[in-house]
């Protein structure tokens, strides 16, 4: 019952129970200390709760509270499939006092600039096809994979940066030659890096900024924006799986 609102939202976005299980989507209930109390009962210290990024600390360290409350939750996994952080979307569309999306802060194991959401699922197909599609959000990755675009990944609430470039180069077979200042890579030639962010002005700006980071790829780089302003999740919902190429 607590997760009913989360289920309604996700079903309305075209995701069924199988797809939610595939991506490990969950729910963090409302309340300030649900998770903190469970973790304390299992022997974790308050310092460990805060260090994990799952809990925050009040002024003066007087209170430890759940960072994620009343949110749909996505596990963020590294390339090996190990969970290193979480991303959460608020359920209420009316409460503008809290961020719509909230990610785990920087921790000993989570560095947002070094993680691409969905890479654990996409890595084999990226290496095989020499193609990667970079989208903006968690539901966009889900929609793309469910539509057969299994090379889709997303940044985790940050811009596409130098560390992301290095990750993609490695998967595509791009090899840097520092002495020459160029990128070479036989496997990457003919490969593709496609950025497809939201169709609004902010999304287009983000895509062009990401494209600017990419000018040293041996693979071809493209920016794809839907003419109607749809993101991949909206496009799949409006026009079906075949609408995402």
Q: What is each stretch, according to the model?
A:
Residues 1-8:
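Conserved active-site segments centered on acidic
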Residues 13, 21, 144:
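Mid-domain, small-residue-enriched loop/turn segments at the edges of structured enzyme/sensor domains
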Residues 20-21, 25-27, 31, 224:
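Terminal amphipathic helices with adjacent charged low-complexity linkers/tails
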Residues 23-28, 65, 198-200:
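Conserved short loop/turn motifs at secondary-structure junctions
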Residues 31-189, 207:
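Phosphate-handling DNA/RNA-contact segment within nucleic-acid enzymes
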Residues 139, 157-160, 197-207, 225, ...:
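Acidic, metal-coordinating catalytic cores used for nucleic-acid/nucleotide bond scission
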Residues 184, 191-216, 221:
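Phosphate/diphosphate-binding loops
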Residues 218-245:
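C-terminal or mid-to-C-terminal helical accessory/interaction module adjacent to the motor/catalytic core
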